[in-house]
A protein has these predicted regions:
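DNA major-groove recognition helix of helix-turn-helix/homeodomain DNA-binding modules
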Residues: 44-63
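Short basic helix-loop element that most often maps to the first helix and adjoining turn
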Residues: 5-20, 49
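Short acidic DE-rich linear segments
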Residues: 65-68
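Short alpha-helical DNA-recognition segment
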Residues: 15-33
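A detector for short, charged/polar N-terminal pre-domain segments
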Residues: 1-2
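Short polybasic/polar patches that bind polyanions
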Residues: 12, 23, 55
Length: 68
């Protein structure tokens, strides 16, 4: 799955709105919205927070190598 699909998948598996997911990982709603629409990608710090969120919630996602 590509990155925007992966972010949406993570959020939906955790049963969170974009706003709630944003709060969980310490970014704005608009940032999560841009990620899910494929308009931008997270920086290294945000990726670490997303990874920590996935690990804490036992969520596994395999991103396409070309999209990361």
């Amino acid at each position: 799955m590509n990155f925007s699909e992966g972010i949406k998948y993570i959020r939906k598996v955790a049963y969170l709105s974009q706003e709630s997911f944003a709060k969980e990982i310490g970014v704005s709603f608009s940032t999560v919205n841009r990620w899910e629409r494929g308009k931008s990608k997270p920086n290294y710090a945000a990726m670490k927070k997303i990874n920590a969120f996935c690990n804490a919630n036992l969520i596994k996602v395999d991103f396409d190598e070309d999209d990361t």
